[in-house]
A protein has these predicted regions:
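A generic local secondary-structure boundary/capping motif
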Residues: 72-73, 114-117, 125-129, 142-149, ...
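Structural signature of FAD isoalloxazine-binding scaffolds in flavoprotein oxidoreductases
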Residues: 35-36, 42-47, 74-92, 139-171, ...
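Anion-binding (especially nucleotide phosphate/pyrophosphate-binding) glycine-rich loop
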Residues: 2-135
Length: 305
């Protein structure tokens, strides 16, 4: 078993400018507001520092846990014996290399990136304005909403491969699918992406963003902690409709509840635990399988420790 104390000491010695938060409560870093203390959370400030951090952690016998805004995570509320590498504001720069492209770091929130596109008069990211995640996670899972997906705009992605070599993917190498990419469930670490967008009228772009934001506010439980859509969309249907048909709107386990506003969301009504959410998700999957014959697949990523 890896000695995380030794790894933290090595990080301090070999990466002197690295931001390191020891025994950091993960509930502060995920939108479910559930999560126990991680042995350490670190925030690298460059591709080189990210590679150095990951190499030190791996050389110490551990596997780094890479996160962004934590908007698609359910994390154990016990001690998390991991070194968490957060791609945050230190990796969130955005530039415009030419008239139709934006290049941004993996840590930039999608809302900020969409606003940057608006400011440059570029269309194509309106759908992403209300998605609470960051660019790295969004590209990795090909996040989408209201008819748009990240695959529609990603021209290239910069990443560290399994050997921590700096690489760049283009075109079909991204292997985008529904809530999937070539980076999903791999050891690759996304560093940033260049997006190919379309010139547009800023007034039209802003109007579209406002329309989608209003639709989200009216249909989704944005006033309660959640991880967004809890289950992936099954072939030929919608998870929310199947859950509603099973009579589970408002179904509660401890502090976790199937949202009364949108059955596709599991929300934290206050004091929900990791086990509350897991039990509720299991109950929902069992009920939907029984009533509809459909096996729902979690969209939220579960971190058990």
């Amino acid at each position: 078993m890896a000695n995380l104390d030794l790894i933290v000491r090595a990080l301090r010695a070999q990466c002197p400018g690295l931001e390191i938060l020891e025994h950091e409560p993960m509930r502060a870093h995920c939108s479910f507001r559930i999560g126990g203390p991680a042995r350490a959370l670190v925030r690298p400030a460059s591709a080189e520092e990210t590679a150095a951090v990951c190499r030190i952690v791996r050389d110490g016998g551990a596997q780094p846990l890479i996160i962004g805004n934590g908007t698609n995570l359910l994390i154990t509320d016990g001690a998390l014996e991991r070194i968490v590498v957060q791609m945050g504001d230190n990796m969130a720069a955005v530039t415009q290399p030419d008239a139709t492209h934006l290049s941004a770091g993996a840590g930039i929130p999608l809302a900020r990136l969409a606003q940057a596109a608006l400011g440059c008069g570029l269309a194509g990211l309106e759908f992403a304005h209300g998605i609470p995640g960051s660019l790295g996670g969004a590209v990795s899972m090909n996040a989408g909403a209201y008819g748009g997906e990240m695959k529609d705009g990603v021209g290239s992605a910069r990443y560290l491969d399994g050997e921590l070599r700096l690489c760049e993917a283009h075109g079909s190498a991204h292997d985008f699918g529904y809530r999937h990419s070539a980076f999903s469930d791999t050891d690759c670490v996304l560093l940033g992406s260049t997006l190919a967008l379309t010139p547009g009228d800023p007034a039209d772009i802003q109007a579209r963003m406002r329309d989608l934001s209003e639709r989200r506010r009216s249909r989704q439980p944005l006033d309660l902690p959640s991880a967004g859509s809890t289950f992936k969309r099954p072939v030929g249907g919608y998870a929310a409709a199947l859950i509603d048909q099973a009579g589970l709107k408002g179904y509660t386990v401890g502090g976790a509840q199937v949202s009364e506003k949108h059955a596709g969301f599991v929300v934290n009504r206050g004091g929900a635990t990791f086990d509350d959410v897991l039990r509720l998700m299991d109950d929902v999957r069992s009920a939907v399988l029984r009533t509809s014959g459909v096996e729902l697949e979690p969209e939220v990523k579960i971190i058990r420790g």
